[in-house]
């Protein structure tokens, strides 16, 4: 039984174990089935077109959509089946748990009943045990006298006392005239000098046990000075006295007797009796504590009682009482010290309540009875001591003789301890004697007093009587032992039942937790199923819409495909006809070559003359086809050129201000020249002078107006657009793994990166072609500059995350990346005046003329040639961000050398000289572009030049430098090879190379423009933080004059702190800033300790001002009682005590507000506190209360108590109820309820008199057995009623702070 008692099992009556799930592995716990992971239906959405733009067939798209819908339906059915299985599993488990809980509830009820029955059987036995134990002590005598002798001191000589046995002390009187000079004194117990404190307390312990059983016990320590009285009671640090040993024994016995239905409480009182005047030794406590009455009704004293929970608290309280005792040794010798331990026992089942006390009294020195040489100063003290000790001796003698009544009215000590001297009380007198011969007279006097108290003769007494009572005591002891054994057995049985009950409760708790878990799992699954159904329905709706859109798109694509097929068919026919003509021409040519050699020269010339028109005709036909193809290419180039022109306009609109226009730019060369140079020069064929996407720097703005500009992150944007959301989603969801080949990835990434430039208010399902980008660009330009800034800010994080993600693949167009980053840097410059003062190096510092002649191969192999150019920055009003040395880009151009030999070779090869010149120029331009690109990689100084210099101005400066350093380019020419054309081509090649290099990343960091953007952004953040630091520092030193100024300063500092935290949060989430691993540097946050301290001080000052206003509001209420005025002044004093928590700058304002309020309160006239008069005149009219709130108190009777409460104009609690409960339909009375502080100093009878003026329900609800209990109940009732009245809630809170509502037990 003991082995299985602590285990939890299912095998109980009426409970079936859970059945395992079919297919589950043996030994595995029962768990709800889990579904296999499944791909979302949207994973089967049709993929985009490939790199060549081919369209997926319509049938395949529809089949994929049908498969997606089918998968969604299957997922929905699986989820529904899982939810059904889990619901069935939960219901089955809940049913089993419910049945088992019912069984446990029945078992718990039976165990409770058994425990009550056992308690009922034990209680009479415990009472019988206590009675028998008390009878045993009574048989031994209600008054016991012990005698104790201290050891001899070194200077006291020989001893005059002997100890024949444990009950007799023999004193050598030294009187030679007597036959036997030795006298014997018999006591209940005699202790020699060798007896310690422990053995003494062993005989005192039965009296302590009797005190715990409910009987009053008094222990007196009597004897001459320096005989050991104080040592017996107090002891030493290593050998405790009766004070501590008695309480420790009480504490241990109470712990062993305490059950779940009973409880012991201990209190201590200590007083000093001097000249019949009582002084409380524990009354120095500042906080109000409960008091207890001691003594007879005619002459009682009220002493402070302190509750002690353990021996340590008792020791501290006793130590405090002894320290408060008089320090005058003579006064201590003639005073009584009374230490009382009050014992309260309560049984919550039977309702039994017992009260007893254990009093330990340190009596004055016994020589006070013999002092004959008392002077005038202490004769009064000795007279009072003599009277007190004589009366105590008479009382003890009367008790020993079993005479009634006890003479308790003769002295103050007997009046205070009247309930401990007589009746069933137990009294112990411990007599202390000195063994020295010099103290013989005092020893004999002490022994004579104790013999008189014991009522014993100076003989051995009647041995027969003693033997008889000893036999009776032995019988009682044996009977007591049997009863104790029976009680012990019953207690063991109760402990076993309690253990079983605890185990049952633990099982109930476990099952209840299992039930809660099952309910949570069931509710979670139902919620998940519901959300899954909603999500599937939404997906189905979206797929349906997408299906409709795809159908419309497919229909349009079919039309376009049909048109393209027709055009392709026409083109095929044209090609076939041209091929036929070409074949005929070739055949004619072969015939001409195979003709006879004998023909004459004239015939040959005539044949060639005749064939020339035919070849010209066929050549004209092929040239027409070529011309058509060139026209289409020209249209495409013109479209791209228009696109870049519109792009340049977009850049200009982002930064241009009123009165500032863009710099003039050189016109671009013709398409003919571009096509002649070939397609290898990339994007320079159509852009020329517009090759770099840069725009003029705006004029400096007002610093005051833009000092608070903040670089906002994407999550801080307040306004979004549907198209911006689409672009963000497209950039973040771009997956390079969906493309086949690097070319396809590059094409998709570059097209996607161009979307931010051509953003309009419509959504794209696929990447739009270049023709659509032009229309988009026009729409963006039409939207205005403000809208463009919003669009840039909206997609900022997505753009830079996309660029960072694609940088390692090296597939993006670096010129396009440069344009994007320059766009964002200039947008930042337009909003940040602190960046507009940055000075950059001129373009001449980045160009250097090569002085060495080297071949093209050597130039390509060692390019770019760089030489350091040292220069000094201007440290004037403008600042420089790029402080590194600027290196020059070496331009290696040689003049063209014309030779007749090369012209002859070209003519022999059939190549026109102009065509060859264009070919050579294109190769040289490509070489310069590559060198310029390599030079620009990671060059932040060059990046700053591009950002801060307009595009047209930068290209003009490059052309001017080329014309100045290469004089052979300055010759005027009218064709493409002329100076003007060459300067334009060279400057464009350098610009394109630099632009491409600035957008090329250099791992592990990013490209030069990205590094520059990171540094600019950090500078903006740092400027904003320092600006907020300056504002906060100014506010922190400003002196507050009045409450409005305090509130304004606090609000301003909180606003600045909020902005600073917001900026720090933006810095942590900004994707532009480079991390430490990427080469970025951290931003230091300026210290804000002083500002934080001032803000905390202002918050405290604001709270103090609010409390001052509350005091002023309460002081305006009439009438103003004296107690309320005192409470208000104390509240102001508390506020003055809170001033050290403020800074020195806030002290004047706080002190001014408090002192003004104090003057107002002190100047008010108060009404005296007259509770009786107020209660007699507290009848009001119902019209004075604007609103009544009804409360119903259910007390277990047939009719509940109904009380209506409200507030009058003086903010006092007013109630309306029946005057008598027995007459519920009688007249209702209206009374003002006094505050709990009114009853603080009233007696119990006075409180009853106050309640007689109120409705009877108040008396029944608040009246207790004692005054303290009544005050505690009334405080809770008053708080309950006042909390129901809205107008009194603030007053109730103030009363709680003032400690008016305080339980007596606390």
Curated annotation (Swiss-Prot):
Residues 592-611, 660-677 have a biased composition (Polar residues). Gene3D superfamilies: Kinesin motor domain. Residues 855-867 have a biased composition (Low complexity). Keywords: ATP-binding, Coiled coil, Microtubule, Motor protein, Nucleotide-binding. One of its GO terms (cellular component) is microtubule. It comes from the Eukaryota. This is Kinesin-like protein KIN-14L. It comes from Oryza sativa subsp. japonica (Rice).
């Amino acid at each position: 039984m003991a082995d299985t008692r602590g285990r939890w099992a299912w095998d109980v009556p009426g409970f079936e174990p859970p059945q395992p799930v079919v297919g589950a592995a043996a030994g595995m716990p029962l768990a709800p089935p889990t579904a296999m992971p499944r791909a979302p239906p949207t994973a089967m959405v049709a993929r985009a077109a490939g790199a060549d733009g081919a369209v997926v067939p319509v049938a395949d798209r529809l089949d994929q959509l049908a498969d997606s819908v089918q998968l969604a339906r299957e997922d929905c059915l699986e989820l529904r089946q899982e939810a059904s299985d889990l619901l069935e599993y939960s219901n089955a488990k809940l049913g089993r748990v419910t049945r088992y809980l019912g069984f446990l509830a029945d078992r718990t009820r039976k165990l409770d009943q058994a425990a009550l029955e056992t308690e009922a059987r034990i209680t009479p036995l415990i009472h019988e045990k206590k009675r028998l134990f008390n009878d045993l002590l009574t048989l031994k005598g209600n008054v016991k006298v012990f005698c104790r002798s201290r050891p001899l001191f070194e200077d006291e000589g020989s001893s005059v006392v002997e100890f024949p046995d444990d009950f007799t002390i023999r004193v050598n009187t030294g009187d030679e005239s007597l036959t036997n000079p030795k006298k014997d004194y018999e006591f209940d117990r005699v202790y020699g000098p060798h007896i310690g404190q422990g053995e003494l307390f062993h005989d005192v312990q039965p009296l302590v046990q009797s005190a715990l059983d409910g009987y009053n016990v008094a222990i007196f320590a009597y004897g001459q000075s320096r005989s050991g009285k104080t040592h017996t009671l107090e002891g030493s640090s290593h050998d405790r006295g009766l004070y501590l040993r008695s309480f420790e024994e009480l504490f241990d016995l109470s712990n062993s007797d305490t059950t779940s239905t009973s409880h012991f409480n201990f209190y201590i009182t200590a007083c000093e009796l001097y000249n019949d005047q009582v002084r409380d030794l524990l009354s120095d406590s500042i906080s109000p504590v409960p008091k207890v009455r001691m003594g007879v009704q005619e002459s009682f004293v009220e002493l402070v009682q302190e509750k002690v929970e353990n021996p340590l608290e008792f020791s501290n309280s006793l130590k405090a009482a002894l320290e408060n005792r008089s320090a005058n040794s003579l006064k201590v010798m003639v005073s009584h010290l009374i230490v009382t331990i009050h014992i309260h026992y309560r049984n919550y089942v039977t309702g039994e309540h017992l009260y007893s006390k254990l009093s330990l009294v340190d009596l004055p020195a016994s020589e006070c009875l013999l002092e004959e040489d008392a002077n005038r100063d202490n004769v009064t003290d000795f007279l009072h001591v003599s009277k007190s000790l004589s009366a105590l001796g008479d009382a003890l003698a009367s008790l020993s003789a079993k005479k009634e009544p006890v003479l308790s009215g003769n002295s103050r000590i007997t009046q205070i301890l009247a309930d401990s001297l007589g009746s069933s009380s137990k009294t112990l007198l411990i007599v202390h004697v000195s063994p020295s011969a010099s103290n013989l007279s005092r020893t004999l006097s002490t022994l004579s007093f104790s013999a008189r108290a014991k009522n014993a003769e100076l003989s051995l007494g009647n041995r027969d009587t003693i033997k008889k009572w000893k036999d009776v005591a032995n019988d009682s002891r044996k009977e007591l032992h049997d009863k104790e054994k029976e009680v012990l057995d019953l207690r063991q049985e109760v402990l076993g039942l309690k253990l079983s009950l605890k185990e049952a409760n633990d099982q109930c708790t476990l099952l209840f937790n299992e039930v809660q878990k099952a309910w949570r799992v069931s509710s979670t699954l139902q919620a998940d199923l519901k959300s899954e159904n909603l999500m599937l329905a939404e997906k189905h709706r979206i797929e349906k819409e997408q299906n409709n859109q795809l159908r419309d798109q497919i229909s349009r694509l079919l039309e376009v495909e049909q048109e393209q097929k027709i055009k392709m068919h026409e083109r095929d026919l044209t090609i076939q006809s041209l091929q036929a003509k070409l074949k005929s021409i070739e055949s004619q040519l072969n015939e001409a070559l195979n003709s006879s050699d004998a023909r004459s020269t004239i015939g040959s010339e005539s044949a060639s003359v005749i064939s020339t028109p035919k070849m010209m005709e066929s050549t004209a036909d092929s040239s027409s086809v070529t011309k058509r193809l060139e026209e289409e290419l020209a249209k495409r180039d013109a479209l791209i050129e228009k696109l870049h022109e519109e792009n340049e306009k977009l850049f200009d609109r982002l930064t241009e201000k009123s009165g500032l226009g863009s710099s003039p730019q050189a016109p671009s060369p013709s398409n003919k020249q571009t096509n002649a140079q070939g397609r290898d020069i990339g994007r320079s064929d159509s852009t020329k002078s517009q090759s770099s996407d840069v725009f003029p720097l705006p004029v400096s703005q007002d610093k005051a107006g833009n000092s608070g500009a903040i670089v906002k992150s994407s999550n801080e944007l307040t306004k979004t657009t549907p198209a911006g959301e689409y672009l963000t989603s497209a950039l973040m969801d771009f997956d390079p793994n969906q493309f086949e080949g690097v070319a396809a990835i590059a094409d998709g990434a570059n097209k996607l990166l161009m979307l931010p430039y051509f953003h309009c208010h419509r959504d794209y399902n696929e990447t739009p072609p270049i023709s659509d980008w032009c229309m988009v660009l026009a729409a963006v330009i039409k939207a205005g500059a403000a809208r463009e800034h919003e669009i840039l800010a909206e997609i900022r994080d997505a753009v830079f995350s996309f660029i960072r993600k694609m940088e390692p693949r090296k597939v993006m167009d670096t010129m396009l990346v440069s344009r994007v980053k320059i766009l964002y840097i200039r947008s930042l410059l337009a909003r940040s005046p602190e960046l507009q003062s940055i000075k950059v190096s001129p373009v001449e510092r980045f160009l250097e003329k090569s002085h060495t002649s080297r071949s093209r191969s050597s130039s390509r192999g060692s390019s770019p040639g760089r030489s350091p150019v040292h220069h000094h920055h201007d440290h004037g009003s403008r600042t420089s961000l790029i402080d590194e040395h600027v290196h020059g880009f070496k331009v290696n151009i040689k003049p063209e050398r014309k030779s007749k030999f090369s012209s002859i070779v070209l003519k022999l090869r059939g190549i026109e000289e102009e065509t060859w010149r264009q070919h050579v120029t294109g190769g040289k331009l490509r070489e310069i572009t590559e060198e310029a690109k390599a030079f620009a990689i990671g060059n932040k100084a060059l990046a700053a030049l591009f950002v801060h210099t307009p595009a047209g101005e930068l290209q003009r400066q490059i052309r001017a430098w080329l014309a100045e350093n290469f004089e052979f380019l300055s010759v005027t020419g009218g064709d493409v090879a002329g100076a003007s054309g060459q300067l334009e081509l060279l400057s464009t090649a350098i610009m394109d190379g630099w632009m491409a290099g600035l957008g090329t990343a250099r791992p592990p960091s990013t490209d030069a423009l990205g590094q520059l953007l990171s540094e600019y952004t950090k500078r903006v953040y740092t400027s904003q933080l320092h600006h907020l630091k300056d504002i906060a520092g100014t506010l922190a030193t400003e002196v507050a004059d009045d409450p409005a100024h305090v509130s304004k300063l606090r609000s301003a500092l909180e606003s600045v702190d909020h902005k600073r935290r917001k900026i720090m949060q933006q810095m942590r989430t900004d994707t532009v800033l480079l991390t430490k691993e990427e080469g970025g540097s951290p931003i230091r946050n300026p210290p804000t300790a002083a500002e934080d301290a001032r803000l905390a001080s202002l918050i405290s000052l604001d709270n103090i001002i609010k409390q001052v206003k509350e005091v002023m509001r309460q002081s305006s209420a009439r009438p103003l009682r004296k107690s309320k005025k005192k409470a208000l002044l104390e509240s102001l004093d508390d506020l003055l005590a809170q001033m050290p928590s403020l800074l020195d700058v806030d002290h004047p304002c706080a002190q001014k507000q408090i002192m003004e309020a104090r003057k107002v309160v002190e100047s008010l006239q108060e009404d005296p506190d007259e509770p009786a008069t107020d209660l007699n005149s507290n009848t009001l009219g119902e019209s004075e209360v604007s609103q009544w709130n009804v409360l119903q108190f259910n007390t277990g009777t047939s009719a509940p108590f109904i009380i209506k409460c409200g507030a009058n104009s003086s903010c006092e609690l007013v109630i309306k109820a029946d005057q008598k409960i027995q007459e519920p339909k009688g007249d209702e009375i209206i009374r003002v309820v006094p505050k709990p502080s009114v009853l603080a100093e009233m007696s119990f009878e006075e409180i009853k008199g106050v309640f007689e003026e109120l409705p009877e329900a108040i008396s029944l609800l608040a009246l207790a057995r004692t005054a303290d209990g009544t005050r505690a109940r009334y405080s809770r009732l008053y708080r309950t009623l006042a909390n129901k009245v809205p107008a009194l809630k603030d007053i109730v809170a103030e009363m709680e702070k003032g400690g008016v509502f305080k339980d007596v037990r606390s």
